[in-house]
Swiss-Prot record:
Xref: SUPFAM superfamilies: Metallo-dependent hydrolases (SSF51556)
Protein name: Uronate isomerase
EC number of the protein: 5.3.1.12
Source organism per UniProt: Geobacillus stearothermophilus (Bacillus stearothermophilus)
Key words, A-Z: Isomerase
Catalytic activity of the protein: D-glucuronate = D-fructuronate; aldehydo-D-galacturonate = keto-D-tagaturonate
Phylogenetic classification of the source organism: Bacteria, Bacillati, Bacillota, Bacilli, Bacillales
Length: 473
């Protein structure tokens, strides 16, 4: 009997098989947005068991377990690692239709040579087998990246990070995977957060004057950007609940900042103006340095107050947001473009309802000599939607409104060192989609041409777009 994960998994016709095996399969991986720990890579972390590797910090799995009524002690509580793995194994069969089902079995197959399906009957054998392998050489954090043919990844880093771990990795000639930092200044943007003033204090009292009329007073924040640039950073990353845009001069922005510093609660309009001013300032700085700006738009964070107090952030209690997007996004990009200060910008929309809105918007702000300067990327998997169907919809929407071949490829957005099978998953979906177009007579059977598009979407577009490792990049 053929195993569930086989060489033609998800490839539903001969055209898809040719495109995947001849053009996509062997390409390196560029994972330009993830949440891996640079410290764990620098130390080449070893994992004691599969619970550490698989379940530690993976709130996608936690959400699935909670949906089945699993007790929290088996998710984030004090149950033993073995008990937590067993609880996850019992959950897996009920995740059919969810990307977790496919990802789980792809990871078992690719890294541990396990063909069996994970469930209540097989969990102990798989637990013992995988744990035995984890104790061997070749199953450390770095080893998983090398096995996966990773070329470089982009981590997510606080402006206050000294990036010492990134530098230690870069100076190690035995490890060739590039670990590139990304500048994530959400703590400076979210002015109404209770932690805002404490964070600003850490940046230094000089930050208080950064919105005066002369741009030279923005030095505290600008200095961190330039520090990151010196350490190899070429990307910024912003998480935005909604897209702010309300025009605001430097003096007014400074007045709003001073009001917040003095302990006052800001109005929604004041918050929007501050965020707009800060984002525009940073975007212009990114442009001057040749950075890529990433905008993750539309996630409501920590919606369950009781569980947030109990477990903290990033534990599986975020949701897709709905709001007015077209006007503020167009206005923001236009404000930068009219001054020739729009950096390369990736717009991520969590809500599939905004696919056409964003795709039609980014088409307004392309540039001569830059392929896909402002692409759309739909973040997937984090809210238990069907990755496969959602990605097909996203790629089809992009093809309908824009240019499919400019898509900048896959990212994991993950905290796991075995998540790189998601790139394989994406590549199989892309090849199957194009293969289905050939099968239906919608595109010509030109494997060389279509194979080049597959390779661009899966690897070369990202390589060209980010220019990591290129002289000056």
């Amino acid at each position: 009997m053929q195993p569930f994960i086989h060489e033609n998994f998800l490839l539903q016709n001969k055209h898809a098989e040719v495109l995947y095996h001849d053009y996509a399969k062997s390409l390196p991986i560029i994972d330009y947005h993830c949440h891996l720990s640079a410290k764990e890579i620098a130390e080449d972390r070893r994992f004691h068991d599969m619970t550490e590797l698989w379940l530690e910090g993976d709130h996608y799995k936690w959400r699935a377990m909670r949906a089945l009524g699993v007790e929290e002690k088996y998710i984030t509580g004090n149950a033993s690692p073995e008990e937590k793995f067993q609880a996850w194994a019992k959950t897996v069969p009920y995740c059919i239709g969810n990307p977790l089902y496919h990802w789980t079995h792809l990871e078992l197959k690719r890294y541990f040579q396990v063909d069996a399906l994970l469930n209540e009957r097989t969990w102990r054998e798989i637990w013992n087998h995988c744990n035995d392998l984890l104790r061997q050489e070749g199953f450390s954090a770095r080893s998983f990246m090398v096995k996966s043919n990773v070329e470089w990844i982009g981590t997510t880093d606080d402006p206050l990070d000294d990036l010492a771990d990134h530098q230690a990795i870069a100076q190690d000639p035995s490890f060739l995977v590039k670990i590139v930092p990304s500048f994530r200044p959400d703590a400076v943007i979210e002015i109404n957060r209770p932690s805002f003033l404490d964070y600003v204090g850490k940046l230094g009292e000089a930050l208080a004057c950064r919105f005066m009329i002369t741009i030279s007073c923005c030095k505290p924040l600008e200095n961190r950007v330039r520090y990151f640039h010196e350490k190899g950073c070429r990307m910024a990353d912003h998480g935005l609940e909604s897209m702010p845009y309300s025009e605001c001069g430097w003096k007014e922005a400074n007045d709003i900042f001073q009001k917040r510093k003095n302990g006052f609660v800001l109005s929604r309009e004041e918050e929007e103006k501050y965020k707009t001013s800060t984002l525009c300032f940073l975007a212009r700085l990114y442009h001057s340095l040749g950075w890529v700006m990433q905008l993750h738009i539309g996630s409501i964070r920590n919606t369950n107050e009781k569980m947030f107090r109990r477990l903290g952030p990033n534990t599986g209690y975020d949701s897709i947001h709905d709001f007015f997007l077209a006007q503020p996004l167009n206005a923001f990009l236009n404000e930068l473009e009219r001054r020739d200060q729009l950096p390369k910008t990736i717009v991520y929309t969590l809500n599939p309802a905004y696919n056409y809105v964003v795709a039609s918007t980014v088409g307004n702000f392309q540039s001569e000599g830059v392929k896909g300067k402002v692409p759309i990327w739909r973040s997937l998997g984090g809210f238990n939607d069907s990755f496969k169907m959602a990605f097909i919809r996203h790629l089809t929407d992009l093809a309908n409104v824009g240019v499919f071949s400019t898509f900048v490829g896959m990212l994991t957005d993950s905290r796991s060192f075995v998540s790189y099978v998601r790139h394989e998953y994406f590549r199989r979906i892309v090849c199957n989609l194009i293969g289905s177009w050939i099968e239906k007579g919608e595109v010509p059977q030109d494997y060389d041409f279509l194979g080049k598009i597959v390779q661009d979407v899966c690897y070369f577009n990202a390589k060209q777009y980010f220019q990591v490792g290129v002289s000056g990049g």
